[in-house]
Amino acid sequence: MDNIEQDVKVLRKVLNGPLFLDKYPLISRVWVEEYGTNRIDIILNVKDPYSEYTPLRDEIKSYIYNLAKMLGVTTRFIIYP
């Protein structure tokens, strides 16, 4: 298994688990997809109203980056929205 495949597997499992979804209940699901050979896309499914997500967006992204660092994820990734 390639490093990017392992990173996708780990991120998918953790970001769709209670550690993340219980902390941020306004996110209902997270898609983690390999994009090409050198990047991962992370797509957050935000529950309505979206306006509740906007003030927490930077905090959530920072939490994901820190969590990925602790998990040893080395592949570059982008978080949407």
Report the location of each language-model feature.
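N-terminal presequence-like segments and adjacent domain-start helices
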Residues: 1-10
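Long, terminal "pre-/pro-" and other extracytoplasmic accessory regions
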Residues: 7, 23, 52, 78-79
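Short, aromatic-enriched amphipathic alpha-helices that serve as compact interaction elements
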Residues: 11-15
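Short secondary-structure junctions
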Residues: 16-27, 68-73
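Short edge beta-strands and adjacent turn/loop segments
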Residues: 21-45
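A short interface-forming secondary-structure element
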Residues: 40-59
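Low-complexity, intrinsically disordered Gly/Pro/Thr-rich segments
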Residues: 58-66
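A short amphipathic beta-strand at an alpha->beta junction
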Residues: 65-81
